[in-house]
Amino acid sequence: MLRRAAAVAGATAAAVVGWSLFESQWVEFCDEEVELRGLAPELDGLTIVHLSDFHLGTLSFNARTLERAVRWASERPCDIVAITGDLLSRRRGEPQLERAVSALEPRFGVFAVLGNHDVEITRDPFSQPTDASVVQSAGAVLLENESVSLSVNGRSVQIVGGDQSLGPYWSSLAGLADPEADLRILLFHFPDVVRYLPPEAFDLILAGHLHGGQICIPTPRGRVRLEHLRAEHWEGLHETRAGFLHVSRGLGTSFVPFRFLARPEATRLVLRSAGR
């Protein structure tokens, strides 16, 4: 009896590990429409590919999932690519990062911010800071508490990139928003930034960090996520007082190369005028 129970337990554990390795490569490609109140008609249909949390350089399938996401993004019309941090976990992933970012060719450019793994603000003792020049040489615009303005069909689109090193001063990001811009987008690694921003600070906020929990346990009351238990917005689209928030589950894994009930994700957001 004990041997049979041990054999069943061993087989179950092996199946879970095998599935978790498979799921870490099983990228979900999403097309989502985001209805924004007051969006100018000239900006209706603007497309943004949101990518996050590559965690390149680790012993994992992270580079493979990023390659698939880049290939998917390159096959679709895209105006802007937004990358919301944790690009690298080890410097040995720099060549993979350069290849991936340089292969992206959106109409108006690739814009990125750094995450906690990029600047060693992490529990990972082996994490190495990301060299900003690597991101820039690949063709991305790296935003660190600064903004750029784009002219899109005669309308002004402002993209603000926040640096998490602001710590308790995240609310100051609202001061970077241009009230005259027709569309204000914030790129920030942590979704919790919406708790610190004033009402209607931005029209659209893009974040990552949480990996959708990365490893989740199913229960009768829903999934229990083993990381960041106090998080309010785990994944997907949310209407918050600070602005419309999209949280990406990201493409990579951290600490362990597994995902369970939290597939990696690449999303193309199509902006629409609410009530059109």
Task: List each model region and its residues.
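N-terminal membrane-anchoring alpha-helices
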Residues: 1-42
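Alpha-helical scaffolding within the catalytic cores
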Residues: 29-36, 97-99, 142-146, 171, ...
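Mobile, glycine- and charge-enriched loop segments
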Residues: 33-60, 162-188
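Beta-strand-turn-beta hairpins that frame and shape the catalytic cleft
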Residues: 36-49, 140, 147-159, 180-183, ...
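Membrane-embedded segments
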Residues: 42, 46-141
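Active-site metal-binding loops of divalent metal-dependent hydrolases
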Residues: 52-56, 85-87, 116-118, 146-147, ...
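Binuclear metal-dependent hydrolase catalytic cores centered on His/Asp/Glu-rich metal-binding motifs
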Residues: 122-140, 146-147, 152-188, 192-196, ...
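Conserved beta-sheet core of the metallophosphoesterase superfamily
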Residues: 191-270, 276
